[in-house]
């Protein structure tokens, strides 16, 4: 099983596309056929070219597999005070080896304070039989 965590460039769409192409090429050349989880801060909402490249590679967006939509409540980035600013830019993609059992974005804070400008997104996975 391969688990890769990434944090793509926050300024350039072209750089993000090249980064995700490099990740996919690395997986294909070194681990093709192995169960694969790719997650992290992709610095782009799901309407962009990075998302399309991941979907076209055959990886599955766990958010979509859970039946969730991208709407005003589905954001992972905020202004440190819990106010959404750019949407769902943190993703978890999986290969067909996995079943997504559960998941969500955690919006909780402690005394109105947040340890990051990203809300955690988690999924519970099981191997397909």
Model-derived regions: residue spans:
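Preference for well-ordered, secondary-structure-rich cores of eukaryotic proteins
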Residues: 21-22
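Metal-dependent phosphoester-hydrolase catalytic domains
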Residues: 14, 18, 28-36, 44-129
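Short, well-ordered alpha-helices that flank and scaffold nucleotide-derived cofactor binding pockets
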Residues: 25
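Active-site flanking residues adjacent to catalytic metal/cofactor-binding acidic residues
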Residues: 6, 39-41
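Active-site-proximal beta-strand elements of phosphoester/diester hydrolases
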Residues: 1-9
């Amino acid at each position: 099983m391969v688990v890769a965590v990434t944090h793509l460039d926050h300024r350039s769409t072209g750089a993000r596309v090249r980064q995700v192409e490099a990740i996919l090429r690395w997986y294909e050349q070194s681990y093709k056929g192995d169960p694969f989880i790719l997650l992290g801060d992709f610095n782009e909402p799901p309407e962009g070219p990075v998302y399309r490249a991941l979907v076209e590679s055959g990886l599955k967006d766990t958010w979509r597999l859970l039946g969730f939509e991208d709407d005003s409540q589905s954001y992972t980035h905020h202004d440190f005070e819990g106010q959404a600013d750019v949407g769902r830019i943190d993703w978890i993609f999986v290969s067909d080896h996995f079943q997504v059992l559960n998941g969500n974005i955690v919006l909780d804070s402690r005394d109105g304070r947040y340890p990051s400008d990203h809300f955690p997104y988690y999924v519970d996975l099981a191997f397909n039989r």
